[in-house]
C-alpha cells in the first residue's frame, strides 16, 4: 500500500489528472451505466472541496491578518484593479466577437423556459445582495459558503487578534497550517474525482446535445481562450515586465484544469491557495485576493452574458449600436461581479442584460434554457477562466514574480 502511495506521489498530480480525464471519457462513452455510477466519486471530490473551502478561507485570512506586520507587503488593490479591468475587457471581447460572427439561437421559441429560479430584477438587486452578504451572520456565512461574509468577518477578527498574546496568534497560525494540510490531502484525490465527474457527464449528456449549438459554443469558448491566452498575458506582462506565458500556462495547468471539471470557483479556492503557496506568493495578499476573486473576478461570466444576449438580439432582429454595446459591457461587468450572489450564476443574469434591448422576459428565459443546454462546456470553460485568472492576477501583482528571472 505504501509503495502505491509513493508511486502516486512520484508521478505527479497533473499527469494523473490527464489519465483520469481520458479514462473518464472512455468509460462514459463505452459504459454509460458505469459512468453514471462513478459520478459518486466526482460528487464526493467536489463536496470535499466545497466543505473545506469556507473554513480554509476563514482561518487563512484571519491568521494572515493577525500575523501581519506593518512592514509586510500587501498588494490587494492592484489585484482588484486587474480583476475589474480584466472583466471589462472580457465583456468588450464578447461584444466584438458577437458583431464579427453574428449567431442565431436555433429554436428560440420552441425551448421551454427555465422557471424554477427567478432572475434579479435589476442591477440594484444584484448589488444589494452583494452588500447584504457582507453583513451576514458569520456562522451562516461559513455554512452557506458566502465568501463576502467570510472575508468580512475574517478581516475583522484578524484585526482584533493583532492585540492578542503571541501564544494565541501562534495557535491561530498553527490552525491555519493544519487546515492547509487537510486541503493538500483532499487535492491529492483530484485525478479520481475528475475521472468520476467526466465519466458521469459524458454518460448523462453525451455529445449530441452540444452539436446543435456548435457555432454559439465556438464563439463562447473562443472568447474565453482569447482572454486566457492573449488579453491576460498582456495584462500580466505589463505588471511583471517579462515573458508572461510560463506563469500563464502554470496557472491554466494547475488551476484551470481542476476548475474546468469541478465547475466551481469556490471549490477551486483550495487548489489556488495551494498553487499560490507553491509559487511563493505573499500569504497576506493571496489569502484575501483568491477568495475575493472567486466572488467578483468573473471574466467568463461577462463573456457568457454578452454573447448570449447579443445572440438573442440578433435572432430577434433587434438593432444594437456601438453605444448600446458599450453600455452592455459596463452592465455585464458590474453584473458579473455579483454573479456569485445570484442562484444560477451568470446565466440568470442574462434577462437583466436582455432588458437593455427590450427583449421580453419570457424570451430571455428561453435564452437561459439554451445556456443550461450548453452548460456542460460553457460553465466548465467559464469556471476555468475565472479561477485560473484569480491566481494569475494575484501572482502578477506580487513583487516576488517581478524579481524572478525569466
Curated annotation (Swiss-Prot):
In the bilayer, the protein is annotated as:
Multi-pass membrane protein
- Keyword line: Amino-acid transport, Cell inner membrane, Cell membrane, Membrane, Symport, Transmembrane, Transmembrane helix, Transport
Q: Which InterPro entries match?
A: Na-dicarboxylate_symporter, Na:dicarbo_symporter_sf, Ser_Thr_transp_SstT
* A GO cellular-component term linked to this record: plasma membrane
The listed locations are: Cell inner membrane
Might you name a Gene Ontology BP term for this protein? Answer: threonine transport
Keyword Transmembrane belongs to the record: yes
Domain of life according to the entry:
Bacteria
Chain ranges passing through the membrane: 11-31, 45-65, 79-99, 141-161, 185-205, 216-236, 298-318, 330-350, 357-377
GO molecular-function term, one example from the UniProt record: neutral L-amino acid:sodium symporter activity
Q: Which reaction does it catalyse?
A: L-serine(in) + Na(+)(in) = L-serine(out) + Na(+)(out); L-threonine(in) + Na(+)(in) = L-threonine(out) + Na(+)(out)
- Please report a single Pfam family linked to this protein: SDF
The primary site where this protein sits is: membrane
Summarize the protein's role. Answer: Involved in the import of serine and threonine into the cell, with the concomitant import of sodium (symport system).
As for family, the record states: Belongs to the dicarboxylate/amino acid:cation symporter (DAACS) (TC 2.A.23) family.
Protein name, per record: Serine/threonine transporter SstT
Species annotation: Psychrobacter sp. (strain PRwf-1)
Q: Which gene encodes it?
A: sstT
Amino acid at each position: 500500500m505504501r509503495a502505491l502511495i509513493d508511486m502516486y506521489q512520484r508521478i505527479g498530480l497533473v499527469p494523473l489528472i490527464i489519465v483520469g480525464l481520458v479514462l473518464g471519457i472512455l468509460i462514459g462513452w463505452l459504459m454509460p451505466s458505469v459512468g453514471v455510477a462513478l459520478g459518486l466519486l466526482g460528487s464526493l471530490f467536489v463536496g470535499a472541496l466545497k466543505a473545506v473551502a469556507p473554513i480554509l478561507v476563514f482561518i487563512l485570512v484571519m491568521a494572515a491578518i493577525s500575523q501581519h506586520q506593518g512592514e509586510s507587503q500587501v498588494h490587494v488593490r492592484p489585484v482588484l484593479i486587474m480583476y475589474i479591468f480584466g472583466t471589462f475587457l472580457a465583456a468588450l471581447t464578447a461584444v466584438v466577437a458577437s458583431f464579427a460572427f453574428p449567431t442565431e439561437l436555433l429554436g428560440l421559441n420552441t425551448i421551454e423556459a427555465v422557471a424554477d429560479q427567478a432572475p434579479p430584477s435589476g442591477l440594484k438587486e444584484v448589488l444589494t445582495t452583494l452588500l447584504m452578504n457582507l453583513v451576514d451572520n458569520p456562522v451562516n456565512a461559513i455554512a452557506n459558503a458566502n465568501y463576502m461574509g467570510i472575508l468580512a468577518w475574517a478581516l475583522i477578527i484578524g484585526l482584533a487578534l493583532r492585540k492578542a498574546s503571541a501564544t494565541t496568534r501562534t495557535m491561530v497560525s498553527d490552525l491555519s497550517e493544519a487546515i492547509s494540510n487537510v486541503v493538500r490531502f483532499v487535492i491529492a484525490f483530484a485525478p479520481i474525482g475528475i475521472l468520476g465527474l467526466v465519466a458521469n457527464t459524458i454518460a448523462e449528456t453525451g455529445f449530441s446535445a452540444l452539436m446543435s449549438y456548435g457555432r454559439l459554443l465556438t464563439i463562447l469558448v473562443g472568447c474565453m481562450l482569447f482572454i486566457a491566452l492573449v488579453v491576460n498575458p498582456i495584462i500580466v506582462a505589463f505588471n511583471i515586465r517579462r515573458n508572461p506565458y510560463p506563469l500563464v500556462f502554470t496557472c491554466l495547468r494547475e488551476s484551470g484544469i481542476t476548475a474546468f471539471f469541478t465547475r466551481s470557483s469556490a471549490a477551486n479556492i483550495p487548489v489556488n491557495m495551494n498553487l499560490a503557496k507553491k509559487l511563493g506568493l505573499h500569504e497576506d495578499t493571496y489569502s484575501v485576493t483568491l477568495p475575493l476573486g472567486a466572488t467578483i473576478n468573473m471574466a467568463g461570466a461577462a463573456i457568457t452574458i454578452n454573447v448570449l444576449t447579443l445572440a438573442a438580439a440578433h435572432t430577434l432582429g433587434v438593432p444594437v449600436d456601438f453605444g448600446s454595446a458599450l453600455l452592455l459591457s459596463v452592465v455585464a461587468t458590474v453584473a458579473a461581479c455579483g454573479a456569485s450572489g445570484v442562484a444560477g450564476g451568470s446565466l440568470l443574469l442574462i434577462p437583466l442584460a436582455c432588458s437593455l434591448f427590450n427583449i421580453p422576459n419570457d424570451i430571455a428565459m428561453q435564452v437561459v434554457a439554451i445556456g443550461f443546454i450548453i452548460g456542460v462546456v460553457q460553465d466548465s470553460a467559464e469556471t476555468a477562466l475565472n479561477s485560473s485568472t484569480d491566481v494569475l492576477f494575484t501572482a502578477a501583482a506580487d513583487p516576488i514574480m517581478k524579481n524572478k528571472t525569466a
